[in-house]
């Protein structure tokens, strides 16, 4: 049995008057119609590369660089713990990404020399003017990498949060809302929040969370840009200015009173 949660239609009619629920209900009903065509749960098969060794990591970063130079937008996401980059994710398609961890339960994941080489490879991608980058709340990642490592993002930089807020200004623009609207990925943001706030979950869950955060923007941004590029109907011309009213006519003069009768 497949279930799609949705707001009750009565929430956008009197007395609720929550009109913003109407387009959300419409989208959910369209999704329900699509899902009713088959019994199975069908989602895109996605791959998040975790626990890669140094050589595998460098090879994947070189692959990202080549694809980026060919026109593929590259997703970037960093996870910061106590002011340090805990892991960094890169996505190069709607179904492929890597999480590069810098620590795990045993301490540092890479040696200092390996970590330096990895960050230089990441910098080559981020600083290349011919490679388009995208991220969720990308302004945070960009300023952090600039101040912490001196990595200056160049080229086309896209942010799903900004694109979402311009496209749909009345609705949430976080990555959870973007994921729901533009992908078939189930809700996963709680995994990262629980890991950060309560330390619950496994390292694998944390790295998968980072990989999804780098992957989702790659799938979402083309759809968001399509909405932004749609021609909007022009505003109707203002009504013509009515001619000025003529000045009112002066009231007619009363005739003089008749002369008095003779005595």
Language-model segments: which ranges?
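Extended, well-ordered alpha-helical scaffold/bundle regions in very large, multi-domain proteins
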Residues: 235-244, 262-263
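Gly/Thr-rich phosphate-binding beta-strand-loop-beta motif of the actin/hexokinase/Hsp70
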Residues: 64-91
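Glycine/proline-rich loop-helix segments at beta-alpha junctions forming the active-site rim
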Residues: 1-44
């Amino acid at each position: 049995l497949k279930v799609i949660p949705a707001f009750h239609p009565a929430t956008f009619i009197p007395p609720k008057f929550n009109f913003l629920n109407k387009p959300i209900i419409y989208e959910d009903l369209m999704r329900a119609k699509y899902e009713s065509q088959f019994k199975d749960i069908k989602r895109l098969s996605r791959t998040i590369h975790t626990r890669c060794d140094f050589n595998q990591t460098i090879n994947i970063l070189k692959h990202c660089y080549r694809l980026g130079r060919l026109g593929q937008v590259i997703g970037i996401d960093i996870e910061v713990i106590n002011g340090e980059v805990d892991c960094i994710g890169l996505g190069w398609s709607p179904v492929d990404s890597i999480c590069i961890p810098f620590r795990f339960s045993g301490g540092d994941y890479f040696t200092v020399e390996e970590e330096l080489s990895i960050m230089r490879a990441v910098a080559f991608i981020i600083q290349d003017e011919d490679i388009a980058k995208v991220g969720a709340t990308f302004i945070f990642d960009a300023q952090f990498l600039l101040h912490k490592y001196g990595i200056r993002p160049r080229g086309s930089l896209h942010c799903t949060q900004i694109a979402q807020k311009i496209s749909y200004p009345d609705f949430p623009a976080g990555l959870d809302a973007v994921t729901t609207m533009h992908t078939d990925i189930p809700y996963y943001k709680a995994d990262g929040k629980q890991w950060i706030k309560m330390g619950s979950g496994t390292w694998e869950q944390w790295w998968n969370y980072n990989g999804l955060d780098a992957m989702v923007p790659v799938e979402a941004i083309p759809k968001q840009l399509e909405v932004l590029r749609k021609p909007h109907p022009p505003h109707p011309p203002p009504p013509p200015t009515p001619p000025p009213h003529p000045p009112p006519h002066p009231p007619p003069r009363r005739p003089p009173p008749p002369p008095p009768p003779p005595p």
